[in-house]
A protein has these predicted regions:
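Short, solvent-exposed loop/turn elements at beta->coil junctions and helix N-caps
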Residues: 3-7, 102-107
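Short, well-ordered beta-strand micro-motif
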Residues: 17-19, 43, 119-121, 145-147
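Nudix hydrolase/Nudix homology domain
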Residues: 63, 100, 108-111, 135-202
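Acidic, metal-coordinating catalytic segment for phosphate/diphosphate chemistry
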Residues: 3-42, 46-47
């Protein structure tokens, strides 16, 4: 890295311009979105139905079906803690069992956003008196429980397009086909650059 500057200071994320020496490839400039990261939750009930929320997403100009999800915007909060918070706030649910389903980079050519997708099971309702009051885009959230196989078909047909939905649903289906073997613990390390043969997160 030769130089780095913030060219746009946003409410949630910034746009950064880096000057990087790539050796024989030369010196290049790259602008990208610097993102705090996020988590999402594939919550499955005892009948292997996945919880999806319909929520308006302004950049897409549409309401999208997606799992509970949110930014890593609480300093020092563990990833699983952030996921549990989002599950409670957006879906009024608490999970008794957690695993890591997948790690992915949403747009590695234009953003450093890294996301972790959790699997949550053994679900119970948050008591009414303790429920989060939703407002803004979350105020009119619609909740639907969808059989996992039906969700897979919707992904493959292009009806489910949110990236965490696509990654999470397909990962859950793959894990189910393997008898749920190989799920990672909630404190498994996540590495933004490890490859398939490196034993780290993808």
């Amino acid at each position: 890295m030769i130089a780095s500057e913030v060219v746009h200071d946003g409410m949630i994320w910034d746009v950064v311009r880096d000057t990087v020496d790539l050796g024989e490839a030369g010196v290049v400039r790259r602008e990208y979105v610097r993102h705090p990261g996020a988590v999402s939750v594939i919550a499955l009930d005892d009948d292997d139905r996945v919880l999806l929320l319909r929520q308006y997403r302004h950049p897409a100009g549409a309401e999208l079906w997606e799992p509970p999800a949110g930014l890593l915007d609480v300093p020092g909060e563990p990833l699983q803690g952030a996921a549990a918070r989002e599950l409670a706030e957006e879906a009024d649910l608490v999970a008794g069992a957690w695993w890591v389903l997948a790690d992915y980079l949403s747009t590695p050519g234009g953003s450093d956003e890294a996301l972790r997708v959790f699997l949550a099971r053994d679900l119970t309702q948050v008591p009414v008196a303790d429920r989060h009051v939703r407002d803004g885009e979350e105020r009119d959230i619609v909740v639907r429980w969808v059989p996992l196989e039906e969700a897979v078909e919707a992904v493959l047909a292009g009806r489910l397009r949110n990236p965490s939905t696509v990654v999470g649903v397909l990962a859950a289906a793959a894990c189910k086909a393997r008898g749920w073997r190989g799920l990672r613990s909630v404190d498994a390390p996540g590495d933004r650059v490890a490859g398939p043969g490196d034993g780290g997160g993808a």
